[in-house]
Amino acid sequence: MEDEAALDRGASFLKHVCDEEEVEGHHTIYIGVHVPKSYRRRRRHKRKAGHREKKEKERVSENYSDKSDVENADESSSSILKPLISPAAERIRFILGEEDDSPAPPQLFTELDELLAVDGQEMEWKETARWIKFEEKVEQGGERWSKPHVATLSLHSLFELRTCMEKGSIMLDREAASLPQLVEMIVDHQIETGLLKPDLKDKVTYTLLRKHRHQTKKSNLRSLADIGKTVSSASRMFTSPENGSPAMTHRNLTSSSLNDISDKPEKDQLKNKFMKKLPRDAEASNVLVGEVDFLDSPFIAFVRLQQAVMLGALTEVPVPTRFLFILLGPKGKAKSYHEIGRAIATLMSDEVFHDIAYKAKDRQDLIAGIDEFLDEVIVLPPGEWDPAIRIEPPKSLPSSDKRKNMYSGGENVQMNGDTPHDGGHGGGGHADCEELQRTGRFCGGLIKDIKRKAPFFASDFYDALNIQALSAILFIYLATVTNAITFGGLLGDATDNMQGVLESFLGTAVSGAVFCLFAGQPLTILSSTGPVLVFERLLFNFSKDHNFDYLEFRLWIGLWSAFLCLILVATDASFLVQYFTRFTEEGFSSLISFIFIYDAFKKMIKLADYYPINSNFKVGYNTQFSCVCVPPNPVNISVSNDTTLAPEDLQTVSSADMYHNATFDWALLTKKECLKYEGKLVGNNCDFVPDITLMSFILFLGTYTSSMALKKFKTSRYFPTTARKLISDFAIILSILIFCVIDALVGVDTPKLIVPSEFKPTSPNRGWFVPPFGGNPWWVYLAAAIPALLVTILIFMDQQITAVIVNRKEHKLKKGAGYHLDLFWVAILMVVCSFMALPWYVAATVISIAHIDSLKMETETSAPGEQPKFLGVREQRVTGTLVFILTGLSVFMAPILKFIPMPVLYGVFLYMGVASLNGVQFMDRLKLLLMPLKHQPDFIYLRHVPLRRVHLFTFLQVLCLALLWILKSTVAAIIFPVMILALVAVRKGMDYLFSQHDLSFLDDVIPEKDKKKKEDEKKKKKKKGSLDSDSDDSDCPYSEKVPSIKIPMDIMEQQPFLSDSKPSDRERSPTFLERHTSC
C-alpha cells in the first residue's frame, strides 16, 4: 500500500476526453520562476457526489485526513482550498528542520546524457545539457554550448517525473566503487523487486555501460582518433536477430567499445576549463535517459551513493558522482524521456530540492520535494509565450532562504511574496550591534573592542597577501597624496605657512600609519577635513589679532580636545551612534561626495582661469596674433643691434647691468623672465596659453570615464574572467598611467604634481616641537577648553559617522568594529600632532568608502550565467599602513611624481565622489522625481509606502542637505559638526510626520529603550505559536495577509506512461491525470 498511489480526487470533475493533439499541446505549458500561490477561489455551484466519488473520498480520508469520518462531500472535495499546510510541506519541514552539525551539502554539477546513435550505427551516451544554476544545451550543430538560460519545463514532464519517483527504484546511501558495480547493483535491485525481467539483465547492463561522449573542445587530430575508435567498436558490435538490439555477453563487457570503466578521470576531463566554474568540493549528478527496443515498460532508478565516487568518464568534468538517475523506456517516446531528464536535472539544481535530495530518508521524502517544487512554480499559457525563447539569467537571484526558513522552523515568511519587513534593508539600525552596547563600566567598551580585535591581529597581516591589495595601495596612495597636497596648500595660505604641504605630508603619514596598525577598524582612512581647515583659519586670525602664540594656543586646544575624547571613550559614549540612522548617514556621506565632485570641477575651472582659452583665434589670421617683451623705459636702456645676450646668460646679468650697461635683446626673454625684470608684454595673444586648458579637460574627463569603464569591465563579455578581474581591480591605476602617457606623448605643458623635495618646516619661524608654556598668558591654557569643546564635537561626529558607514552590514565585515578603540587612537594622535604642530586628522568618508570598494571580494567560482556573489571586504591592516608610509616617503619620490598631471588626479577625485554615491538610497529616491510611474524600479519601499510620502521624505532630506551646503560655504562652517548632530533631531521629529511603517522602509526605526524587551516578547510568541498553519498572523504588522492554496500532490495518482507490474484487483475508470498525461 505504501508504494501504491492514491486515487485522483478530482477525476470525476472532468468529463472531456482529450485527444492526441490536445495532449501534445499540453507539452507547451512551461514553468518559470515562483509566484504567489495565495489565491482563493470560491465555489459557486454545489453538486451532489456520486457513489464512486464518495467511495474515493472515503479512502482518501482514511489515508490522509485526521478526521474520523467525512460527512459533507462538498466540503471534502474543496478541502484543497483551505489554507492548511500540505502533508508534503509537513514532511519537508521535518527533513530541513533537523538540526545537525553536518556541513552544508556541496554544489552539484548535473549532466544530462541521452542514448543516441552515432553515425546511424552503434548507440552511445551523448551529453546534451548541463546545469549548475542554469541550463546550458548543446546546440543542434553539436559544436558549441548555448548561453546559460533559465530552464523552462513542461508541466507534463514534472507530473511524469513524480510518477517515475513513485514507480521506479529508489536506492539511497548505497556503496559502489565503480560504474560496472553500480550498474549491476541497480539491475539486480530491479529484478528483485519485479520491475525487470531477468532475461533482460545483460541487455540493460550493456546499454548502461555504453561509451559516454562529452561536449568538449578537441583538436582535429583527437577528433580523427575518436572517429577511428568508433569504426573499430562498430566492427565488433553485432545485432540480435530477435529485436535488433545489441546482444550482451561477458566478453562484451571488456570491449573497448564500452565506457572506460576506470575510476580515474581521463585527460580530457582534467584539461576541461569548465572546472573553474565549480567549487573544489563539488559533486556530480548524472542523468541518463534514452529509448531502447527491448523494453516493454520503463526502467527507472534514482540512486544516491553513501560517498561520492569517481566513475571514470561518466561525467564531463573530473568530479565524483553522488546521484544517478536512469530512465530507459520503449521506443517512440524520446521527447517525453528528454523532458523528464531535463525536469530532474533542473530539480537537482534547485537549492531546496538539492538539500532534500541529500537528506531524504525514503521515497516519500523525494516525492515531497517534487510537490514543494510544484507548489512554487507558475504556468505560462501556451498562446502567450514561445517556449523556444531562452530566458536570460536575472542579474540578482531570489534567495532560497525564504523557502528554507519556512520549512526549517524559522521565522514566519510569506512564500512567493514579500518577506516580513525587519526594518533596515541593509543600512541598518545599529541598536542590535554588539560593538555599540553600553557596558556601564569604566572603559568597558574600549576593553571589549581590544578583546574583540586581538584574535584577528595576526590575520590582519597575512590576509593582505593578494594582488588586489596592491591595486588598493596604489589607488588610495595617489588619492591621499593629492588630498594632502591640496589641503596643505590651503592650510599654508590660511596660517601664513605655519602649517604647509610638508606638515600635511608628515602628519598624514604618522597619523595614518599608527591608526591603521592599532585601531579597531583599519579600513578607515584618516585625512583632514573642511571644517578643520575653517577652524584653523579662524584660530590663526584670532591669535594674530590678540597677539597670542598660535601654535601654543593650538597645542592646548588639542590637549583639551583629546582629554574630552578620552572621557567619551571611557564612558562608552559611542553608543550614541545607534541614533545615526540611514537619514543621517546618507545625508552626511552624500554631502561629502557632492563636495568632492564640486571641488574637482572647481579646481578645473580655476585652472581654466589661469590658462585662458583664446576663443577669438582664427586660423587664417594667425599672423596677427603675437606677444613680445619690451623694456619698461626704452630711453634708459641701450639696445644694441650687434650684440645680444642669450637667455642662458641672463643669470649672470644683474638687474642694474640690464638697465645701464648691458646690451640686451628683450624679445628673447620668456614671459616669467620678462615680468621678473619689470619688462612689459605687448600683443593681443599675451593673456592666452594655447591648448593647456583643453588638454587638461581631456585628461580630467578621460581619467574619470576610463576609471568608470574599466571598473565595470569585470562584467564585460571580452577577455577571460581572470583578465577582466585584474583589469577591474587595477582600473584607477591603469587610467592614471594611460593618461600620463597621453600627456607625455602630446607634450602640452599641463600643470603637474608638485611635491616638497626638502624635509624641513615650511616656515623658518617654527620647529618640529611646540613648547607648551611661555608664549601665552596662563589663563589661555584654561580658556582653550571652550574652543576644544567645539573641536571635540567636530572630531566625534566626523569619526563616528564615517565609522558607521564603513561598518555597514552590507559590507559583510567579519572581524567586527571598534568604535571606542578608533576614537581612543584619534585622541592620542591629536596629542602627538598638537606637539609637533601638524594638522589634526579624522576619518575621511569618501576615501574610506573608496578603500572598501577597492578591497571587495567576490566568489572566485560562479555558475555560468550567475553573477558573482559579494563575499565581503578583505579586512587587513597592510594596505592602509603602506599607503601612509608611502605618503611619508613621497618627499623622496618627487622626481617620479612630478610627471603626473594634476587634471588626472582631479579626475580621480571626481571618480571617488561619484562612485561613493552608488547604491545610496537617497540617490535612488532623487532619480524617482524624474521618472514616470511606469518606468520606476521595483524598490521594496515603493511597494509599501505611497509615492507622495516617498517624495516628501526625499524633499526633507534635500532641504537638510542644502542647508548644510550653505552653512559649509560660509564662515559659520565651524559649527558644521553641530548641524550634523542636528540631523538626528530632525530625524526624531519625523516620527510625528511619518508613520513607523513608512519610516521602517524609508529609514531605520530609532531604537527605543524598551526595544529589547519587545524583541524578547516577540521571540517568546514565535516559540509558542503553531508552525502547522500558513494562515497564522505574522509577527510583523506590515506583512500582507492573504490565503494560501495548498495542493497536496500526495493524494494524486498519475500513470503517464508507466504500466503497473501488479494489475489492480478492481476495475476503475481512467483518472484526471491519466487522461492528461498518458502517451
From Swiss-Prot:
Main location: membrane
Extracellular side, ranges: 492-501, 543-550, 610-692, 746-779, 837, 895-901
Cytoplasmic side: 1-466, 521, 572-585, 711-725, 808-819, 856-877, 919-960, 987-1079
Compositional bias ranges of the Basic and acidic residues kind: 53-70, 1062-1079
Region spans: Required for basolateral targeting: 1057-1059
Record GO cellular component, one term: plasma membrane
Ranges annotated as spanning the membrane: 467-491, 502-520, 522-542, 551-571, 586-609, 693-710, 726-745, 780-807, 820-836, 838-855, 878-894, 902-918
Gene3D superfamilies: Helical hairpin bin (1.10.287.570), Mannitol-specific EII, Chain A (3.40.930.10)
Entry's family note: Belongs to the anion exchanger (TC 2.A.31) family.
Stated role: Electrogenic sodium/bicarbonate cotransporter with a Na(+):HCO3(-) stoichiometry varying from 1:2 to 1:3. May regulate bicarbonate influx/efflux at the basolateral membrane of cells and regulate intracellular pH.
Protein name: Electrogenic sodium bicarbonate cotransporter 1
